[in-house]
Amino acid sequence: MNKILIIDDEKDICYLISEILHDEKYITESVSNSSEAIKKLETFRPDLIILDVWLGPNSELDGIELLKKIMTINSLIPVIVITGHGTVDMAVNAIKNGAYDFIEKPFNSEKIIILSKRAIESAKLADENKLLKKIAHPNTPLIGNSSFIII
C-alpha cells in the first residue's frame, strides 16, 4: 500500500483528504506544521506528500519554504501543493521549487485521486529508470568492445 503524508494546518482539510485517499486504499498520516512534517519524515516514509502553502502562524516555515526543505531531504518524493489563496505566480513558484503539481481549494476529490495516482506512478517509474541506468552503466563498455557486434 502506498503512503501519503498530508501537511495542512486545517484539521478538516486533513481529514477530508485522508478520507478521500483511504477510500482508494492509501495509508495516510497528517501533520499541521513544518516542524511536525520534518519530524514525521524521519519515521514515516511517504510515497507522496500533499502540502498546503499556508501552514498558519504555528509553523516555522511556510509551504514553499517547507517544499524546499523536503527537496533537500528527499527530492524523489513527489509533492502536490494545495492552497486556498492561489495565483499563477504561486503555482509556478511551487513547481520551480520541486512540486509535482498544484491544486487550488476548494478541490475536487477526483482530482486529488488522479493526481495522487499519477504522482506516485511517475515517482516509481523514475526510481526504476534510475535503477536501470545503474545496471546498464557498468555494462556499457562491454557492448562497445564486443567482437560479436557488427555495425
Where are these regions (language model features)?
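Active-site residues of response regulator receiver
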Residues: 8, 52-54, 83
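C-terminal output helix
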Residues: 87-89, 107-116
